[in-house]
């Protein structure tokens, strides 16, 4: 395993660890999810370029689309929770049910 792959895996692991440790605030969780998506995007791009698999060249773009959708939904949820309750605790998400 090359040093680049190892660094990307470490970045993904640190983001996952941050998501597990700082899950009380919604903003921290969203930042850790974005770090994980960025690591997956870079890893998939490098792997596709290294194996010269041109048919799979759309996979990183699709991953970026899903990451953008996840970020938009997460930020809108963050705005809704912070406007309603004044704080961005994840435990307040249970109170938003109809």
Curated annotation (Swiss-Prot):
Gene Ontology BP annotations: ATP synthesis coupled electron transport
Membrane spanning residue stretches: 1-21, 25-45, 67-87
Pfam family, one: Oxidored_q2
Keyword Thylakoid included in the entry's annotation: no
Keywords on record: Electron transport, Membrane, Mitochondrion, Mitochondrion inner membrane, NAD, Respiratory chain, Translocase, Transmembrane, Transmembrane helix, Transport, Ubiquinone
Membrane topology recorded in Swiss-Prot or TrEMBL: Multi-pass membrane protein
UniProt-listed InterPro entries: NADH_UbQ_OxRdtase_chain4L/K, NUOK/Mnh_C1-like
Domain of life from the UniProt record: Eukaryota
Locations listed in the record: Mitochondrion inner membrane
Catalyses which reaction(s): a ubiquinone + NADH + 5 H(+)(in) = a ubiquinol + NAD(+) + 4 H(+)(out)
E.C. numbers: 7.1.1.2
Gene3D superfamilies per record: 1.10.287.3510
Protein name: NADH-ubiquinone oxidoreductase chain 4L
Gene this chain is encoded by: MT-ND4L
